[in-house]
């Protein structure tokens, strides 16, 4: 008795097993974290590996303001972001932070270092805490991209239309306002 492959007999697990990017530094990090996730029985390394293998759209940026807000209650921990840490001009004072990220923008790096904090790379983090102790994993909002606004669910929200122009006549009348016949 075999399995019916047409009726989803053998469903493969989703998620990437190998890195698609050609970036040599990222490839070395994946190799390092594959080793660590195999040799240590801590889930931190497995999660970091999973996030390193993700496509770029899931490595969403995280601003300094969100980062400092999350790290308020954990001043002795290192914030680990598998993505980019960006600057936020709305913040007047940046607290002392210990940050590990794939990339930190130039202005964000200057502000973190000026406040007495430190910016680490992932290999420096492994040397410091290979099991992920005293580390807090953070991530940016993946649904905040401009492209995501165009394919929202019909039930939850109105999807943003792809319009050729933003004038009065272009997709702003019938079906968009109650004053113009009806609103969906």
From Swiss-Prot:
Pfam families: Ribosomal_L18. GO terms for cellular component: cytosolic large ribosomal subunit. PANTHER family: 60S RIBOSOMAL PROTEIN L18, LARGE RIBOSOMAL SUBUNIT PROTEIN EL18. GO terms for molecular function: RNA binding; structural constituent of ribosome. Gene3D superfamilies: 3.100.10.10. InterPro entries: Ribosomal_eL18 (IPR000039), Ribosomal_uL15/eL18 (IPR021131), Ribosomal_uL15/eL18_sf (IPR036227). GO terms for biological process: translation. This is Large ribosomal subunit protein eL18. The keyword Ribosomal protein applies. The gene is RPL18. The keyword 4Fe-4S does not apply. Keywords: Cytoplasm, Ribonucleoprotein, Ribosomal protein. It is found in: Cytoplasm. Belongs to the eukaryotic ribosomal protein eL18 family.
């Amino acid at each position: 008795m075999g399995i019916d492959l047409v009726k989803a007999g053998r469903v493969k697990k989703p998620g990437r097993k190998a890195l698609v990017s050609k970036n040599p530094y990222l490839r070395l990090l994946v190799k390092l974290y594959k080793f660590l996730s195999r040799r240590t029985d801590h889930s931190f390394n497995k999660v970091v590996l999973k996030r390193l293998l993700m496509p770029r759209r899931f490595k969403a940026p995280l601003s300094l303001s969100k980062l400092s807000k999350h790290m308020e209650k954990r001043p002795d921990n290192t914030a680990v972001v598998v993505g980019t840490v960006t600057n936020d001009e709305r913040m007047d004072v940046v607290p002392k932070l210990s940050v590990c990220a794939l990339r930190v923008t130039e202005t964000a790096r200057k502000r973190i270092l000026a406040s007495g904090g430190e910016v680490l790379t992932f290999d420096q983090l492994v040397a410091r805490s290979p099991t992920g102790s005293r580390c807090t994993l953070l991530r940016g909002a993946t649904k905040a991209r401009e492209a995501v606004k165009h394919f929202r669910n019909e039930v939850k929200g109105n999807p943003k239309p792809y319009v050729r122009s933003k004038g009065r006549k272009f997709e702003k009348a019938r079906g968009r306002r109650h004053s113009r016949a009806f609103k969906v």
